[in-house]
Design a protein with these regions (language model features):
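Short, conserved loop-to-beta-strand elements that form functional interface hotspots
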Residues: 76-87, 108-118
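Short capping/connector residues at structural and topological boundaries
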Residues: 8-9, 14, 44-48, 55, ...
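N-terminal presequence-like segments and the immediate start of the first folded domain
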Residues: 1-31, 92-140
Length: 140
């Protein structure tokens, strides 16, 4: 699935707006990693346990976002953003959101991108159903 943070898709024609979509996950923070983070913050350095947890949470939110876009008939998401909220002292909410659209590549560059994404023909929309394998985004 083509996912962009911009509000348009250069080289693509948006034929239908499928609606706002989001993927959400709420995670509890491990008390032991928080204690370790407290010590680490006194001396500086990356909080690797918390970084790993955040990356996993973002991946889960993205996979849910993609599933929602597919269920609405979209083959692309525009205006994608992340929102992170702390709920109390022990929970973190991660939300990935954007607008699902049906888009068709119209330039050669966009047609190449479509072929790399497995869209098949240049005018194919929507994209194939999501695979059983979750996708991984960003560091992690």
């Amino acid at each position: 699935m083509l996912i962009v943070t911009t509000n348009d898709l250069p080289g693509w024609e948006i034929q239908r707006v499928c609606g706002e979509v989001f993927g959400l996950t709420v995670r509890s923070r491990n008390a032991f990693s928080q204690i370790g983070a407290g010590f680490k913050s006194m001396f500086g350095g990356e909080l690797q346990g918390m970084t790993k947890n955040l990356a996993e949470s973002r991946n889960e939110a993205m996979n849910r976002l993609i599933a929602e876009a597919h269920s609405r008939g979209g083959n692309a998401i525009i205006g994608m953003r992340f929102d992170t909220t702390e709920l109390g002292d022990v929970w973190t909410e991660i939300c990935a959101y954007g607008t699902a659209v049906q888009a068709v590549p119209v330039t050669d560059a966009a047609k190449y991108t479509a072929s790399q994404l497995g869209y098949g023909g240049a005018a194919q929309a929507p994209a194939p159903a999501p695979s059983a394998q979750p996708q991984t985004y960003g560091a992690g």
